A protein has these predicted regions:
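Intrinsically disordered, low-complexity Pro/Gly/Ser/Thr-rich segments with frequent PxxP/GP/PP motifs
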Residues: 123-157
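C-terminal interaction-tip segments
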Residues: 1-15, 84-108, 161-179
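Small/polar beta-strand repeat architecture
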Residues: 16-85
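Beta-strand signatures of extracellular beta-sandwich domains
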Residues: 44, 116-120, 171-173
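Short, charged beta-turn/beta-strand-edge "cap" motif at the junction between a beta-strand
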Residues: 49-54, 148-151, 164-166
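Extracellular and analogous surface-interaction loops
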Residues: 34-37, 88-97, 150-152
């Protein structure tokens, strides 16, 4: 496969479910919510009591289990917890590599939003933050370019989360077919 430059464009990214009145166990991996509608396994947990990139691993009724323990030392009640669903904006083709050259994330909303970009290493089964909790003001964009180039191996993914439903448009510049 010959190397080729392309753009991966994804419109209106942002899947967000929030519950107020949630309870977070002390240094634990459970969150109790009033309902679990709209929450999915692999959703990112967005709350001050969890480290960046914490994911939902299991849902049993109104109990949500996470892959990382909370940082609070005592149970925290009356918490607002957001669950951000992933949008896969690019997948590297099988048997080849791709390179993320840069990207533009554009705010679609009438207020500020926060965005998260992660890489999914398919062969290792690991997610890593490329951008975490970055604010984009109303009427603005964020550019990914100064951090160097990100190599994506076969079937690796670029996933984007936004704290606002349909809040961001994505345009990634990709060099694909790299051997």
């Amino acid at each position: 496969m010959a190397e080729a430059f392309s753009n991966s464009i994804t419109r209106t990214v942002g899947v967000c479910t929030g519950y107020s009145g949630s309870t977070i166990g002390a240094a634990g991996t459970t969150i109790t919510v009033s309902a679990s509608t709209g929450i999915g396994v692999s959703d990112m947990v967005f709350n001050q009591n969890f480290v960046g990139g914490t994911k939902v691993t299991q849902i049993e009724g109104t109990t949500i289990y996470t892959d990382t323990a909370s940082t609070n030392e005592a149970a925290a009640s009356s918490q607002v917890v957001k669950f951000l669903g992933p949008t896969t904006c690019y997948s590297s083709a099988a048997a080849t590599k791709s390179i993320l050259i840069g990207g533009t994330l554009t705010n679609n909303e009438n207020g500020a939003i926060k965005v998260f970009v992660e890489t999914r290493d398919a062969s290792a089964g690991v997610d890593a933050n490329l951008v975490y909790n970055a604010p984009i003001p109303e009427g603005s964009s964020m550019i990914i370019s100064d951090a160097g180039k990100t190599v994506l191996e076969a079937t690796d993914e670029l996933r984007v989360y936004c704290d606002t439903k349909n809040g961001v448009d994505i345009n990634f510049s990709i060099l694909s077919g790299v051997s």
